[in-house]
Amino acid sequence: MSDVARLAGVSIKTVSRVVNDEPAVHPETAGRVLAAIEQLGFRRNLGARNLRRGSTTGTIGLVVEDVGNPFYSELNRGVEQVATSFGRHVLTGSSNENSERERELALEFCARRVDGLLVVPAGTQHGYLVPEMRAGTPVVFLDRPAGDLVADTVLVDNLGGTIEAVAHLAQHGHRRIAFLGDGPGIFTASERLRGFREGLVRAGLRYDERLALLRTPTRESVADAVDRLLTGPGRATAVIAGNNRVTVHLLRALAHVTPRPALVSFDDFELADLLDPPVTVIGHDVGRLGRAAAELLFARIHGDDSPPRKVVLPVHLLPRGSGEVAP
């Protein structure tokens, strides 16, 4: 608070009164204090004590796409495991793939003076976090990088995983391999598409843009994609699904399709190994993704000021049956 008081030309006691909305502060004085808080990158928060160096609210913030998605539920569990070990609680919110909602949640968590912030980006503009970071709030991005901000980032090997999926299908005789991914503006979808194209090159196969579709996965959009990819003389004999949600909709759409194409899913999901045939997946430890990001965040909270890091976690192919179907 001393920095705010110095800039506003008032006492620390006056700053405390303004932050706590106490009466008997002249409006012009309060305006100077609030302007100083904004200039220094602070936010009005739950108490003046949070402006003091070294204070803690015992919380961290986590912004994900959708807490109802099992992928993010598992990621949240990993974050909570680490946070609990440090005596912190996790505030979690869903952006619903909306960049403005992401911004609102992140800034609301910062206004509550979380000790650190974890963000799965919904957009590519994150300059709004610069004042918070300058004010001392550590920020780590996970699953996707920030578009315009150099910051700690924890990812999985999207590129390598899809390359491996293509190689696996090619080894089983497939030459017409399709890719169905999430929306084109999503980092993981574009990276997995890039891996798909690279995998085709490595396997000596031609890229056919008609067999690569990116779209927001809904029951209707995936059913339409199946019609496009799996009918006609140039149909695909194998499909790589870009994430768990795409796979679930794809399985529903394939229920009455014959012959069934080979299928590899990027992301494992519950009961995948019990289906008929069991689903071959590019698996990775989602809980580990959350833990790795949280561990990096707490390193920053505890004073690690080394340059921003990019951590890429490995993936692995789990052959179960659907990816081994012959053309």
Report residues per predicted region:
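N-terminal helix-turn-helix DNA-binding module of bacterial transcription factors
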Residues: 1-56, 324-327
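Short, solvent-exposed amphipathic alpha-helices that sit
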Residues: 32, 70-85, 161-165, 187-206, ...
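N-terminal helix-turn-helix/winged-helix DNA-binding helices
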Residues: 38-71, 75-77, 85-86, 108-111
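Structural motif
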Residues: 88-111, 162, 211-233
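Flexible loop/hinge segments that line or gate small-molecule binding clefts
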Residues: 97, 119-164, 245, 267-279
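Periplasmic-binding protein-like
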Residues: 113-121, 178-181, 212, 233-246, ...
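Hydrophobic alpha-helical segments within soluble ligand-binding/sensing domains
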Residues: 152-179, 194, 198, 202, ...
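Flexible loop/turn connectors
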Residues: 223, 227-327
